[in-house]
UniProtKB/Swiss-Prot annotation:
GO MF term list: ATP binding; ATP hydrolysis activity; RNA binding; RNA helicase activity; translation initiation factor activity
Protein name as annotated: Eukaryotic initiation factor 4A-13
Annotated organism of origin: Nicotiana tabacum
Record-annotated membrane-spanning stretches: none
Residue span of motif Q motif: 40-68
Top EC category: hydrolase
Role this protein plays: ATP-dependent RNA helicase which is a subunit of the eIF4F complex involved in cap recognition and is required for mRNA binding to ribosome. In the current model of translation initiation, eIF4A unwinds RNA secondary structures in the 5'-UTR of mRNAs which is necessary to allow efficient binding of the small ribosomal subunit, and subsequent scanning for the initiator codon.
Subunit structure: eIF4F is a multi-subunit complex, the composition of which varies with external and internal environmental conditions. It is composed of at least EIF4A, EIF4E and EIF4G.
Amino acid sequence: MAGLAPEGSQFDARQYDAKMTELLGTEQEEFFTSYDEVYDSFDAMGLQENLLRGIYAYGFEKPSAIQQRGIVPFCKGLDVIQQAQSGTGKTATFCSGVLQQLDYSLVECQALVLAPTRELAQQIEKVMRALGDYLGVKVHACVGGTSVREDQRILQSGVHVVVGTPGRVFDMLRRQSLRPDHIKMFVLDEADEMLSRGFKDQIYDIFQLLPPKIQVGVFSATMPPEALEITRKFMNQPVRILVKRDDVTLEGIKQFYVNVDKEEWKLETLCDLYETLAITQSVIFVNTRRKVDWLTDKMRSRDHTVSATHGDMDQNTRDIIMREFRSGSSRVLITTDLLARGIDVQQVSLVINYD
């Protein structure tokens, strides 16, 4: 459990950073963890029966590597740092830990989860609700672009878990619509992305409004200095789990690398792929919003039907585009990596990292 600690008193960030550097440079180890217990099945984790029902109903059969190591320490109330790439099962890890610890007879917010984007927050809400379907969990997403009054109404009626973006969550706390008195779990998902988007001050402001003894989970693809600073200030002897990037591969997914000597040849190669392969739906990742617009125009000029979404678009437009893509009426989506962290579309058969 963590309170706001004096800098450097709770967590040796330099030791952690040095160990990560050492691990990333070796081929002998796949994981660095300060928690030795590994559970090969969900049944062995001591989870509530109705939580297990939700996990299996959602489609999970066997825990991923990070779930084998990360669910139980979170369920025990320990502070946890988990560093791994998207797609490794981090979301289900902290959702399971939260759902295991809730007091369902108390309809008050007991867990607060922050995410960098509206799309990701809504995706987490969906997973939390699905895994907790047999537990009767009440979850609400507090995100920008939605009605403040509706947020206030739902929060005042009572929820167990709030998932949201830092700006809207802080606003709800400031308005006293979100009462922090019973919050015992605080999760930062995609912490590196939140910090890169300038949410550091809001995260600190939110933490100051929470009870002094609170469990903290930090989940991130990378651990930049700003994220390590958060671990020092907020966390108490956290369990640390790092999965090497090279070891993050998902079963059933084939990965290919196309060596293109010149930047201008990428477009030709991309169009060749779409003319050669039978693709159900696909997502193309690019690094910038400007690149989204450029690639969309280029592909449309070559008679490819594509949709595009990025952070400069208004929220209603983004919602419409995502609904069309999920329904299958749009087959190709061009987007930035950050927005893509909230995308979950079962029919996608091809993912292209353009940059």
